[in-house]
Amino acid sequence: MFLQLFNIVLIYGVRTSQSTWINYPENCTSISLQDGLRELCGGDQLMNIRNQLLDDTYKEIGEICTPNYSMEKKSEGYRCASIKKKVICKMLENFDHEVTYISESHPIDKAKCHELIINKDLLNNIEEPYYPPPKCDSSKSSVSELEFIKLINYDVILDPVGFQNEDNYLFQFDKTNPIPIDYIYQSEFCQSKNWICHGDKSYIPLEIFKGDNQASIRLELIKLSIIYDSNFGELPIRDACRLHYCGKPAIKLFNGAIIKIKESPIVLGLPSCNRSRIEMPETNLAKKRYSNVGPVLLTTLNKRFELCKKIKKNLELKQPIPINNLHYLAPFEPGKHPALVYRLVSTTINQSLRNKVVPVSMLSMSMCEYITGQIIEDGIKRNLTDEDTVIILANNKEIKWKDLKGRENWYQEQANPNIIDKNPDHLSYYWYNGVMRREDKFTYPSRYILQTLKKIYTDTERESRISFFKFRLERNITKTEVIKFRDIEESSDQDHSQSVNKTLEGDDYWNWVEETTSDKNKTDGSRGDEKQTIQNKEYWNEESSIWGISTIITVLGIYYIYRKNRREKIFLNMKHRVQRFFKLDY
């Protein structure tokens, strides 16, 4: 949940999900550009989470485990039974004898069985039950009866939650020790060694992405959720309860998932599960619901890191940087990291921000404490009001529209009078890491990794309609508009602003920014290896490529001229011109 990489807004976001995970900067203080550059890209490591809260709480939680539902639930062992053999002899009217044989078996409770095994050595003193000889009397029916205590081998599948009942037990025996061993919890499913566990390594280790280990990804996100719940929530783990599972203490989460963590005050503060929670269907965290998503995430991490280092190198060399590529420098981990803001952005007639280049002298750096949160997307509204809640952080802090607008370091773009001369209200304001607002709406760049992790975590959460952070806000939230662009092409020119507004007026807004869920097993692939010629011509574009209408028209025009001139026998001259055109840099 805390890996924030890409500047793309996923147009395949879940239709039922009403929020976008973000990494929000707070408590920012200005630092020099030189100091900020040293901290960019996480220093010299792929992941760099510096957060005292996480440092302290991770050790308290320790290892987190969940059942492996592919394991066999069958248990095999011994139980005691009282077996009665009866023989009834009755004389008939013709003076014949009718003999009836009856066998009865009655279970013996666990404590009594344990005592009998030790006192009577049932394991070695094996006696097969047999019927006594009939005793027939001429005057009345007679009954002969024998009772035997026997160990019976059982092969059963028992409910992992129902083991508290004394009638449910199985014993096994060590060859060197006649004392019975409680074995009901020893099915493959219940054995702790077969559970899927995520170690107490600090933070999200890169190993969880190898081999497409979606269970470890979910466990890590649950672990991070527990950290925030235990520090900021009303309960140590929100909407969770304690129960005995496979005979050991466990926790049932709000979505039915079963987990085990180290005994600590976090666990002891939970209530016991009532019957309805016990009977609630379980969620299999180990189920692989997406194909090959782990390696894609790992590849994305590495490519993002390499791209970030290239941009950082250009900044250190005082070279100007295309404005949209600066978003790649935004930190993707919580904790203390730099934030970048551009103090001056000029309005251009170009439709895409890709053509805007920001000089290094126009960049400012701040050191901020990042905390994970989510943007509230509860519908569409033309204008945000000051009291509208637009962001809720993991510590339950609300960020209202007036709070966001009142933050430091908002810079208004510089108007070009040849483009915008009558309505300066349509100018954009730029903030940290590419956050932008125009009039009473704002854009917050989303990240591919964050939203992919959200999908993995919330794929079972949707059914319960409970948000990941489980906020304690029981009230209706005023519907607000949060505009998200596919390729962060939030151009500040007037024409593009009008086209965006027209788009939002239609009924296809949700189809634009969200996905359909018709195929839950659809592969979440990478964004491809598209090349983008910028500065050193080695930048890898992590975003979705979107061609504007003007670009398409330009290409078609070039193609038309190319065909026309080829017919006119001046092909080589035209080929040279086309090559020169495409070699132009930004």
UniProtKB/Swiss-Prot annotation:
Transmembrane residues, as ranges? 545-562
Does Glycoprotein count among this protein's keywords? yes
How does the record classify its membrane topology? Single-pass type I membrane protein
According to UniProt, the name of this protein is Non-structural glycoprotein GNS
Glycan-modified residues: 27, 68, 274, 350, 383, 476, 501, 521
Q: Which residues lie on this side of the membrane: Extracellular?
A: 15-544
Give a single Pfam family match: Rhabdo_glycop_FD
